[in-house]
Amino acid sequence: MTNIRKSHPLLKILNSSLVDLPAPSSLTSWWNFGSLLGICLAAQILTGLFLAMHYTSDTATAFNSVTHICRDVNYGWILRYLHANGASMFFICLYLHVGRGLYYGSYTYTETWNIGIILLFAVMATAFMGYVLPWGQMSFWGATVITNLLSAIPYIGTDLVQWIWGGFSVDKATLTRFFAFHFLLPFIISALVMVHLLFLHETGSNNPMGIPSDLDMIPFHPYYTIKDILGLLIMLTALSTLVLFSPDLLGDPDNYTPANPLNTPPHIKPEWYFLFAYAILRSIPNKLGGVLALVLSILVLAIVPMLHTSKQQSMMFRPLSQCLFWLLVADLFTLTWIGGQPVEHPYVIIGQVASILYFSIILVLMPLIGIMENHLLKW
């Protein structure tokens, strides 16, 4: 008799995705982040669901409802901080996952890569709208500043902004719709994750060497399930340490002040995971140019597969490309730092140089170094 996991209509889908899935034998810990992202998404949906049971999306009561969750609801404080810091963990895993894809040339699987970019945009939109919900000072002004960027779109910009706001300023209508979308988007993300996996399982996983691994495959379970559980334990240790010892470490103190349209905070800035894009936005003195650069800072990933000039897929045996990759990582750290600094000398010029370097590395230097390495290897 066939094992039920191989014959049952539902279980056999799970079996072919999680148990008997053939995986390359040489996958490193950099391949852990896919499963960690899945766990992050599930945790965010779960904690978010329980928070939504006590939250009210009204400008008069939103701030107080979050306070009520933390003070009066059983374990409400841990739910709130798990959700807030879980988002930070989500983005850490996301950026490492994308970085792994860039380093090992996984972007050559274009369908999987493009769905991944759509997922990245969806998660960023969800996180932005979630940041508005506590209705603190940074929530209100963050929402005002970021949505106002759309007014830079020629002809329809102003109407578009007022349409999103549901009025002439960020107010009750804005908060209500942001809550609705913040609740809805994670389920859309879950559906996109299924499509992401569907495309991935069409081609099979990449591996660190970037060479076909059809001859040397091992079952996903028990080898990679055990490896993923170790990754999960490390992430849970980091998350629980953050939540239990310094839950507000990554947040902004201004968000503990209720939203006040008459009082602007001295430095309006988003959560840390958007600071690199915010720095790129601020480095261009023109509004429309800044908005385009902001969108392109993520959208540039979509043209990376077209700019792959090397005859090797992975960077594992390409030391010059490796140097460039780590320069890009250092540049992103610099942009993140600059995004949190006030707009004054020398931060402005550092931000502009870092922004130019960011686009130069991806669009110019990496393809050129790829060609150069081919010549060095006489290919």
UniProtKB/Swiss-Prot annotation:
Cofactor stoichiometry and binding remark: Binds 2 heme b groups non-covalently.
Main location: mitochondrion
Subcellular location per the Swiss-Prot or TrEMBL entry: Mitochondrion inner membrane
Binding positions (heme b b566): 97, 196
Cofactor names: heme b
Primary role: Component of the ubiquinol-cytochrome c reductase complex (complex III or cytochrome b-c1 complex) that is part of the mitochondrial respiratory chain. The b-c1 complex mediates electron transfer from ubiquinol to cytochrome c. Contributes to the generation of a proton gradient across the mitochondrial membrane that is then used for ATP synthesis.
Protein known as: Cytochrome b
Gene source species: Micronycteris homezi (Big-eared bat)
